[in-house]
Swiss-Prot record:
Protein name in the entry: Photosystem II reaction center protein J
Coiled coil: none
Gene that produces this protein: psbJ
Family the entry assigns: Belongs to the PsbJ family.
Quaternary state and interactors: PSII is composed of 1 copy each of membrane proteins PsbA, PsbB, PsbC, PsbD, PsbE, PsbF, PsbH, PsbI, PsbJ, PsbK, PsbL, PsbM, PsbT, PsbX, PsbY, PsbZ, Psb30/Ycf12, at least 3 peripheral proteins of the oxygen-evolving complex and a large number of cofactors. It forms dimeric complexes.
Topological category with respect to the lipid bilayer: Single-pass membrane protein
Cell compartment(s), UniProt: Plastid, Chloroplast thylakoid membrane
Organism superkingdom: Eukaryota
Keywords for this protein: Chloroplast, Membrane, Photosynthesis, Photosystem II, Plastid, Reaction center, Thylakoid, Transmembrane, Transmembrane helix
A Pfam cross-reference name: PsbJ
GO biological process entries: photosynthesis
Length: 40
């Protein structure tokens, strides 16, 4: 896991991507339940 070739670590990309996906899903579910996400 110490092979740093100047690129962004995969675990960091996975963590950020997971947080973004969970955030988007939360926004979509909240919008659909509150009636604001029908246009999305």
């Amino acid at each position: 896991m110490a092979n740093t070739t100047g690129r962004i670590p995969l675990w960091l990309i996975g963590t950020v991507a997971g947080i973004l996906v969970l955030g988007l899903l939360g926004i979509f579910f909240y919008g659909s339940y509150s009636g604001l996400g029908s246009s999305l």
